[in-house]
């Protein structure tokens, strides 16, 4: 049944949902990659669609910006609409010199300055990690398409405009591949409610150098990331 944030019914969503932050990006994915896509949510403009990819039913829906927003949608998709796997597809900023623009990053783990997972885990540190099989399938899908990917820790920040830029030094020291704002929350929600999750991000800018991709470059690399996500779903079905 419908929730306060999703006006869909059970069965409207596939068991796997791709989730970009931008709802218009969700619309683009549905129109570009899915066959027979239909709109299944439009509450607050957070568009969701369900269609098929190579005959496999798949959904895509925006999750907004930040852990509070994405946590609402992830939780409701899992508990109210039977979603089993969530793949976040978005952008991230790099802090390490060896991580370049347009690199595709697979978030094996997600560090965070948010307290949401401590709230879940009785004020202890919770290791927010992706599902191993989903990570492996994404890596295999990338290899099959001859796309180089980076696999490791990312950082989910609560603030886009940070008052503590020295934290980037710490991130670099600890090998953080990219900074974004949602993965740790999605991983925590998935763990709490018995689902699986993965974040795949494209490096759209470099925090250290100020370098940025052009809109055309972002579009091309974004498409590679989406193809990796979709193909990984098919690989998961064959396990």
Curated annotation (Swiss-Prot):
GO terms for cellular component: cytosol. Signal peptide: none annotated. InterPro entries: DeoD-type (IPR004402), Nucleoside_phosphorylase_CS (IPR018016), Nucleoside_phosphorylase_d (IPR000845), Nucleoside_phosphorylase_sf (IPR035994). Phosphate binds at residues 21, 25, 44, 88-91. The active site is at 205 (proton donor). It is an enzyme of class 2 (transferase). The keyword Protease does not apply. It comes from the Bacteria. Keywords: Glycosyltransferase, Transferase. A purine D-ribonucleoside binds at residues 5, 180-182, 204-205. The record marks 218 as: Important for catalytic activity. Catalyzes the reversible phosphorolytic breakdown of the N-glycosidic bond in the beta-(deoxy)ribonucleoside molecules, with the formation of the corresponding free purine bases and pentose-1-phosphate. This is Purine nucleoside phosphorylase DeoD-type.
